[in-house]
């Protein structure tokens, strides 16, 4: 039975990097069949899996060749490192239309063709901290059953994570979606791990893994590869392997209890981040 996971978080927090490295570790170390469906108009959710290749998006194919062309997987799906399948929703031309509609259209086509069913895990890498419209589709319509939020010990990252939890609460009962935990993508902020653990405790979830900051992530990206592909023996590759293992074995799924803005600020102040 395929497990569908949506990765959310503040813009620039490292969602795409975390998703691709975790997917690579899942396939390489844990022999899972993995697919990544990028839900960002930038279409950069699968680039490192494909060795730097920017693949043709579903919306580009739809615009240029029509819906029938989207039904041909050779046009819209690529296979990369460890046979990870890659699809990018894409979006409209800049300044025209709604990118969220592209997500809805792309997911609907993939479901119609039953593409997701041939995998153990499908990751939806979703644009920024947006919880409205098409970008909320994985939450709103139960397209993903599990949500993981990438955060750090910075105020805006926590603010975005808390807002995402508010969006989840709104749709959780109707869609069945649940929060699997917070992934800390460390920024080396003082007291970061303790702050994230406190935040998780307050909203009723777990910090599923603390991913330390390591320059090898940027080095691998510069070489257009994931860390696992670049150097599977390095310590950071094993951090992603641990994160992958914890996701595979996770059975702690909750409807979160978001904090008020006052509570969030009070907590952050107590850790000295707003001094």
Curated annotation (Swiss-Prot):
<dbReference type="Pfam" id="PF00142">
    <property type="entry name" value="Fer4_NifH"/>
</dbReference>
<dbReference type="GO" id="GO:0009399">
    <property type="term" value="P:nitrogen fixation"/>
</dbReference>
<dbReference type="GO" id="GO:0046872">
    <property type="term" value="F:metal ion binding"/>
</dbReference>
<dbReference type="InterPro" id="IPR000392">
    <property type="entry name" value="NifH/frxC"/>
</dbReference>
<feature type="binding site">
    <location>
        <position position="132"/>
    </location>
    <ligand>
        <name>[4Fe-4S] cluster</name>
    </ligand>
</feature>
<keyword id="KW-0004">4Fe-4S</keyword>
<keyword id="KW-0535">Nitrogen fixation</keyword>
<feature type="binding site">
    <location>
        <position position="98"/>
    </location>
    <ligand>
        <name>[4Fe-4S] cluster</name>
    </ligand>
</feature>
<protein>
    <recommendedName>
        <fullName>Nitrogenase iron protein 1</fullName>
        <ecNumber>1.18.6.1</ecNumber>
    </recommendedName>
</protein>
<feature type="binding site">
    <location>
        <begin position="9"/>
        <end position="16"/>
    </location>
    <ligand>
        <name>ATP</name>
    </ligand>
</feature>
<keyword id="KW-0013">ADP-ribosylation</keyword>
<keyword id="KW-0560">Oxidoreductase</keyword>
<keyword id="KW-0479">Metal-binding</keyword>
<keyword id="KW-0547">Nucleotide-binding</keyword>
<keyword id="KW-0408">Iron</keyword>
<keyword id="KW-0067">ATP-binding</keyword>
<feature type="modified residue" description="ADP-ribosylarginine; by dinitrogenase reductase ADP-ribosyltransferase">
    <location>
        <position position="101"/>
    </location>
</feature>
<comment type="function">
    <text>The key enzymatic reactions in nitrogen fixation are catalyzed by the nitrogenase complex, which has 2 components: the iron protein and the molybdenum-iron protein.</text>
</comment>
<dbReference type="InterPro" id="IPR030655">
    <property type="entry name" value="NifH/chlL_CS"/>
</dbReference>
<dbReference type="InterPro" id="IPR027417">
    <property type="entry name" value="P-loop_NTPase"/>
</dbReference>
<dbReference type="GO" id="GO:0051539">
    <property type="term" value="F:4 iron, 4 sulfur cluster binding"/>
</dbReference>
<keyword id="KW-0411">Iron-sulfur</keyword>
<dbReference type="InterPro" id="IPR005977">
    <property type="entry name" value="Nitrogenase_Fe_NifH"/>
</dbReference>
<comment type="subunit">
    <text>Homodimer.</text>
</comment>
<dbReference type="GO" id="GO:0005524">
    <property type="term" value="F:ATP binding"/>
</dbReference>
<comment type="similarity">
    <text>Belongs to the NifH/BchL/ChlL family.</text>
</comment>
<dbReference type="GO" id="GO:0016163">
    <property type="term" value="F:nitrogenase activity"/>
</dbReference>
